[in-house]
From Swiss-Prot:
Record keywords, A-Z: Methylation, Ribonucleoprotein, Ribosomal protein, RNA-binding, rRNA-binding
Organism in which the protein naturally occurs: Desulforamulus reducens (strain ATCC BAA-1160 / DSM 100696 / MI-1)
GO CC terms, sorted: cytosolic large ribosomal subunit
Gene that encodes it: rplK
Name of protein: Large ribosomal subunit protein uL11
PANTHER family the UniProt entry points to: 60S RIBOSOMAL PROTEIN L12 (PTHR11661), LARGE RIBOSOMAL SUBUNIT PROTEIN UL11M (PTHR11661:SF1)
Organism classification: Bacteria, Bacillati, Bacillota, Clostridia, Eubacteriales
Stored NCBIfam families: L11_bact
GO terms of biological process kind: translation
GO molecular function terms noted in the UniProt entry: large ribosomal subunit rRNA binding; structural constituent of ribosome
Length: 142
């Protein structure tokens, strides 16, 4: 018989740097999950992606066991990494923070495809371009 799901917890944690401190500890502790067990497993799985924020979906079962699935980093994080900037524009319509060519947008869209609700890479590219525009990043042909 299948285990009963007690809760699904969604968190965004820096890759390889999960600690029992907030937000991880309290989120898992209230469901009775072995926090150190999760932290060790998460850090092992995400060690190769250091420097990125990785969303994770933790499924907690009634017997207090858990499984987790890591997702692709948020588009905003990938765009900032591609441009090498720390923060996006506070006023995206007035102040642009950089220019990104379409080939780089395609790379990011292809990386994000498994987590995006898009039928094609072109649709995923439009989603990534929308995120870029809202961050003050100009998309140029190239």
């Amino acid at each position: 018989m299948a285990k009963k799901v007690a809760a699904i917890i969604k968190l965004q944690i820096p890759a390889g740097k999960a600690t029992p401190a907030p937000p991880v500890g309290p989120a898992l502790g209230q469901h009775g999950v072995n926090i150190m067990g999760f932290v060790k497993q998460y850090n092992e799985v995400t060690a190769a992606q250091a420097g990125l924020i990785i969303p994770v979906e933790i499924t907690v079962y009634e017997d207090r066991s858990f499984t987790f699935v890591t997702k692709t980093p948020p588009a905003a994080v990938l765009l900032k990494k591609a441009l090498g900037i720390e923060t996006a524009s506070g006023e995206p319509n007035k102040k642009k923070v950089g220019k990104l060519d379409r080939s780089k947008v395609r790379e990011i869209a292809e990386l994000k495809m498994p987590d995006l609700n898009a039928a094609s890479v072109e649709a995923a590219m439009r989603m990534v371009e929308g995120t870029a525009r809202s961050m003050g990043i100009e998309i140029v042909e190239g």
